């Protein structure tokens, strides 16, 4: 028992306690919101989310016992496994339509009658593989080499292209692209390369729009938010009803469990993509602001850990996680407030999607791993951190 006690004390001494406190607060708040969402055919979103959180924290604890540098050495195994998982999903996966209008094979069935979306795991894997790629280039002084920058782009293009062309998942593609931009910028990639990227996008997006790569139903989703009232029972339904729910909560909300629109299920997929509307109706403006403050505090603290990192790999992992939380928060809340189109992007740590939640907690584990192991004496060097963005 004494050895166990010492181990716990040693872990707590090294752990980033503020990061844990932020995450635990977010977990409790998300569970309180989902506790009020009615069951669907006997399926409790609260229970599913609780299981996802439990699995996520177990994964976090497991990951933090390893040095992230040693984990990154397995980048080829992680990347290869994720590619095989995506291929398997495309062959044997399940097609489930979400608020993003997707109806492609993006899920696989797992024991217990549950489903898992591999693209969520690939996001976390990308933090590790792309971070390792940047780290290798830095060690070889190749971060300014044009050919190596092209290969970095190819690395990012694999998940982005797969999401756009194969799975028709625009939301995930946007997340991967933003991760690529943030991690590359943090590594000090020269701005001229970003100019080239945006110039290529200016050509590629119109081509994808007109060539059929972006399907018609996706085009409808991407344009409906401009005038949702023109299709109030179709593509505009979720955003119109979501805005009504958020507004009906006013300042303090109707109360947890007492929000009539939540209980009626007025907003489709309110447990997942539209959990922000549940907070708006139940806890009002105050509840919505609390979500924003918690996520902003999380992002700020992750950036602090990135800044304190003793190597580019550690800071890149943190920036990848920051990018996921940032772009998904903007996309989801923007969608709920009719500022952005519906793309099926979940609100980090709050939405009931088991795949998204569990995998995001693994991302949290990697960030915590950086915080705990950045000063390990066998790895720290005086000049190891070269991250011009910081």
Task: Enumerate the predicted regions with their spans.
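Helix-turn-helix-type domain boundary/helix-start signal
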Residues: 112-114, 265, 348
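N-terminal membrane topogenic signal
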Residues: 4-23
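Hydrophobic alpha-helical transmembrane segments of multi-pass inner membrane proteins, especially
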Residues: 20-28, 32-36, 40-238, 277-337, ...
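Transmembrane helix boundary and interhelical junction motifs in multipass membrane proteins
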Residues: 169-174, 254-259, 270-272, 289, ...
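Long extracytoplasmic/lumenal interhelical loops at the membrane interface
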Residues: 250-286, 309, 313
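A juxtamembrane structural motif centered on a specific transmembrane helix
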Residues: 1, 7, 34, 331-390
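Extracytosolic (periplasmic/ER-lumenal) interhelical loops and adjacent juxtamembrane/interface segments
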Residues: 236-257
């Amino acid at each position: 028992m004494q050895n166990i006690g010492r181990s716990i004390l040693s872990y707590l001494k090294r752990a980033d306690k503020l990061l844990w406190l932020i995450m635990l607060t977010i977990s409790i708040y998300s569970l309180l919101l989902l506790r009020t969402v009615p069951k669907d055919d006997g399926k409790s979103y609260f229970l599913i989310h609780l299981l996802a959180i439990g699995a996520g924290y177990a994964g976090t604890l497991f990951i933090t016992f390893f040095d992230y540098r040693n984990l990154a050495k397995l980048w080829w195994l992680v990347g290869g496994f994720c590619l095989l998982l995506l291929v398997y999903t495309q062959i044997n996966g399940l097609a489930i339509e979400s608020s993003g209008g997707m109806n492609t094979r993006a899920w696989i069935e797992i024991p217990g009658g549950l489903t898992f979306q591999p693209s969520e795991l690939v996001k976390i894997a990308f933090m590790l593989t792309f971070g390792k790629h940047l780290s290798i280039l830095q060690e070889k002084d190749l971060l300014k080499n044009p050919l190596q920058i092209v290969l970095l782009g190819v690395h990012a293009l694999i998940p982005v292209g797969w999401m756009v062309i194969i799975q028709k998942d625009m939301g995930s593609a946007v997340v991967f692209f933003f991760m690529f931009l943030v991690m590359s910028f943090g590594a000090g990639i020269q701005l001229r390369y970003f100019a080239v990227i945006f110039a290529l996008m200016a050509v590629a997006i119109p081509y994808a729009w007109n060539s059929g790569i972006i399907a018609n139903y996706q085009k409808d989703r991407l344009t409906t938010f401009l005038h949702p009232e023109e299709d109030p029972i179709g593509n505009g339904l979720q955003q119109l009803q979501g805005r009504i729910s958020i507004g009906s909560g006013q300042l303090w909300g109707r109360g947890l469990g007492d929000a009539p629109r939540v209980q009626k299920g007025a907003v489709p997929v309110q447990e997942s993509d539209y959990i922000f509307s549940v907070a708006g109706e139940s806890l009002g403006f105050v509840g919505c602001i609390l979500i924003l403050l918690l996520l902003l505090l999380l992002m700020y603290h992750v950036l602090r850990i990135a800044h304190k990192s003793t190597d580019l790999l550690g800071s890149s992992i943190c920036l990848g996680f920051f990018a996921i939380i940032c772009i998904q928060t903007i996309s989801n809340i923007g969608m709920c407030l009719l500022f952005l189109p519906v793309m099926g992007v979940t609100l980090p740590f709050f939405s009931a999607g088991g795949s998204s939640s569990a995998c995001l907690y693994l991302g949290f584990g990697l960030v915590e791993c950086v915080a705990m192991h950045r000063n390990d004496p066998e790895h720290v060097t005086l000049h190891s951190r070269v991250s011009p963005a910081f």
